[in-house]
Every structure is written in structure tokens, then in C-alpha cells.
Amino acid sequence: MDKDSQGLLDSSLMASGTASRSEDEESLAGQKRASSQALGTIPKRRSSSRFIKRKKFDDELVESSLAKSSTRAKGASGVEPGRCSGSEPSSSEKKKVSKAPSTPVPPSPAPAPGLTKRVKKSKQPLQVTKDLGRWKPADDLLLINAVLQTNDLTSVHLGVKFSCRFTLREVQERWYALLYDPVISKLACQAMRQLHPEAIAAIQSKALFSKAEEQLLSKVGSTSQPTLETFQDLLHRHPDAFYLARTAKALQAHWQLMKQYYLLEDQTVQPLPKGDQVLNFSDAEDLIDDSKLKDMRDEVLEHELMVADRRQKREIRQLEQELHKWQVLVDSITGMSSPDFDNQTLAVLRGRMVRYLMRSREITLGRATKDNQIDVDLSLEGPAWKISRKQGVIKLKNNGDFFIANEGRRPIYIDGRPVLCGSKWRLSNNSVVEIASLRFVFLINQDLIALIRAEAAKITPQ
């Protein structure tokens, strides 16, 4: 009985064990079947746990993020959430997968931040260096010296000769840039420091004269004949008033220029004559009232004026041709030739300040120095630093004709015609001789020249 009951118990336990095992197997098989049905749409692929950096595009379905999230979920729970969940992919993901190959979206051209910085940096030097091509370092130094001397940008624009022709506005803008723009000021200072000392000395010698300097120079009398020692003594007595690059020679040249334009203290400017007589064209232009001028045109009046102008020009031409004939008669009546000539003077070279007498058949013109003595020192007339030490020679031929030969570097103008170096030109009575802004009138002693021609005519037949 006991054995039978024990056998029945064992058989029931075995049956229940097999039944429970079969139920577990069926449940596991059902779970596998359900998971395989759920994962039927997602293809199985091999993936690595190593993360590879690569460029991502907008039209690409990024799967690395999914792999990252799945590996993180595996590490946390040990079960992959994508494979355990029986849910299908969402409709938005399906749309992304279906639309991605058909219409690829181009990558947005977003500029890198470094590129924009590079563009901004390259634009700045263009604005800074836009004027560096025209304004040379020598121009900047000239501008600074001139402003420090005069404190007036208008005077600087009128008096300083730059390498380019700048307008007053450009000069003002450059001065303000040198003062207030740190970049331009730094670049200009660096360029000026690189100038050669000789170039700096030449630029400093061109500095404008201040009002204090001209006031001291105007005290030197116009009737006196100051030498270089006079101006050197003036420099020693007033070192603070004069610019540091001033020399006695520069002071003498500027004093002669002031004397020529009647700017000295003991010189008086001639007043305008009373009445309708006017000295020059500029004074006549000042007297004209512009408000009374009208722009009304009259064709009949213009025709009459044109005919009258043509008639007057013809009369002027005739008078010019007869001028030398009438000049002899006028001189003999008025006696104008007596104060200029004597029995030994062949001709006179008359300027504004000095009168040079020609008493030999050949005289030399130029600028006198200690080592070079010449007959006619043109520095007595005015500024002569542009005149050569031996500028020219005036000769009297046997036939009574005067000729001038140019031996200097600069041309000599005779009645407006240039006579270059190595050339010569015939001088007639009342010829205007211009040498480096100095003008002279050449007057011939007609009586003495007539005697010379008569003697030459007597000698030639023999």
C-alpha cells in the first residue's frame, strides 16, 4: 500500500514537472515569436561599441544616437528597449525614412565664426591705409612743421608745396587723422622715423616762417646792405624765436623776398592814385561792382563790339610797328636818356631796386661769392638763390648789336622767349630780361652806339 502510494506520488510529481516545463517552454517560445514579429520591420545589423566621429548632414538619418541610447539602456537594465518593446516605429520616423532619399536637403551655408572674424580684420586695414598712398612721410613732416610754425591750416595749404596737389579739406582731414586716429598716427610716425637725416634736414629747411620771425626780419633796414654776419648775429640774439633749422643764408633770402614785396618796417607802400587811374589789373578788378554786371546778351551789340575789337587790334599792331620810330623823337624832346646814360655808358640794365651800367663791351651776369667776382651781381636786386654764379654774358658786337649768352642752368627769358643754356639772343632797346623771377629792362645808349657804328663803317672800307 505504501509502495503503491509512493509510486503514484512520484508519477504525479513527474507529470506536474513535465507539464510546468512544457508551459515554460511554450511561454518562452511565445515570447520569442512575439519579439520576432515585433522586430520584423527593423533589419538586424552588426554594430560596434566604438564611437566613430564623422560629419553629419541634415538629410542623413542619424543612427549613431540610437545606438548610443541603446547601449546606455543595455548598461542600465541589461535589456534593449527597442527590441523588447513590441511597438512599431512612429509615423514621423517613417516619413523621415521615406522622404530622405527622394528630396535631399542641401547643407546650410553657415559661415564659420573664424571666417567672419577674418573678414572683419581684413576690412580695417583698408580703411586705415586708404590715404597712405598719396600722403608720403615727407608730406606728413612738412605738414607738422608748418602747422607748428603758423597754427593756420589755410596758410599751410597756400604756402607749403607737397608731393601731390592736396585740397584744403584733404589737408584738414590729414591733420585731424594725425591728431586723433591712433592707427594712422602710429603708422605715420613709424614712416617718418625711417626717413634719412639728410631728407629730414631738407624738409626742415622748407618750414614756413612764423609771424615772430618775420617781425624780427622786418626790423632790418631796407637801405642797409646786411651781410651773412648780420643775420647770424640775429640768430644768436633770438634763438627762441627762430626755428631750429634756420641758417643765416635762409634768413637773408627771406629778407630779400620781404624787401621785394615792401614788407619791411621802413618801407611804405605807394597808395592808389586819385581819380580814374589804376596801377594794375587786380586793383581795377577790385573796383568793379559785380552786382551791376548783367548776363543779358545782345547779338547786335556783340557784333559791333567784335568789329570794334578787330579795328582796335589792327591799330595797335600798326602803333607797335611805329613805336621804335616815335621813341627816338620822344627821348630827344623830353630828355629821358640824360639821367640814365653818360659818355661812357653803352647800355643800362635797370631793375626795381638797382641800376647796372654797362661800360665795357662785355660784362658777366650772375651771383657774386667770395671766390667768384662778376660784373653784375643780381643778388642786389632781390632773391638770387636760383641764379647761377655765372648766369650769362652780354656782348657788344662791332656793328652795334648787343647779344646775351646763357651760361647758367636756368633759362633766361628775353621778351617772354626762353634762352636755354648754351644759346644766345639779340638784345634790342627796351627788351625785358627775366632771370629767375627778377625782371630788368635793357636800355641802349643810342647816341653812343650810333658813333660806334659810324666808326665801324669808316674802318671797314679800308
Swiss-Prot record:
Detected in testis, and at lower levels in spleen, thymus, prostate, uterus, small intestine, colon and leukocytes. The modification N6-acetyllysine is found at K123, K130. The modification Phosphoserine is found at S22, S102, S108, S282. Residues 301-335 form a coiled coil. SUPFAM superfamilies: SMAD/FHA domain (SSF49879). The modification Phosphothreonine is found at T103. One of its GO terms (biological process) is protein modification process. InterPro entries: FHA_dom, MCRS1, MCRS_N, SMAD_FHA_dom_sf. Residues 1-130 are annotated as: Disordered. Residues 103-112 have a biased composition (Pro residues). Keywords: Acetylation, Centromere, Chromatin regulator, Chromosome, Coiled coil, Cytoplasm, Cytoskeleton, DNA damage, DNA recombination, DNA repair, Host-virus interaction, Kinetochore, Lysosome, Nucleus, Phosphoprotein, Transcription, Transcription regulation, Ubl conjugation. The keyword Amino-acid biosynthesis does not apply. It is found in: Nucleus; Nucleus, Nucleolus; Cytoplasm; Cytoplasm, Cytoskeleton, Microtubule organizing center, Centrosome. Ubiquitinated by UBR5 when not assembled in the INO80 complex, leading to its degradation: UBR5 recognizes and binds a degron that is not accessible when MCRS1 is part of the INO80 complex. A motif (Nuclear localization signal) lies at residues 113-123. Disulfide bonds: none annotated. Component of the chromatin remodeling INO80 complex; specifically part of a complex module associated with the N-terminus of INO80. Component of some MLL1/MLL complex, at least composed of the core components KMT2A/MLL1, ASH2L, HCFC1, WDR5 and RBBP5, as well as the facultative components BACC1, CHD8, E2F6, HSP70, INO80C, KANSL1, LAS1L, MAX, MCRS1, MGA, KAT8/MOF, PELP1, PHF20, PRP31, RING2, RUVB1/TIP49A, RUVB2/TIP49B, SENP3, TAF1, TAF4, TAF6, TAF7, TAF9 and TEX10. Component of the NSL complex at least composed of MOF/KAT8, KANSL1, KANSL2, KANSL3, MCRS1, PHF20, OGT1/OGT, WDR5 and HCFC1. (Microbial infection) Interacts with Herpes simplex virus ICP22. The N-terminal region is required for nuclear localization while the C-terminal region encompassing the FHA domain is required for centrosomal localization. This is Microspherule protein 1. It comes from Homo sapiens (Human).
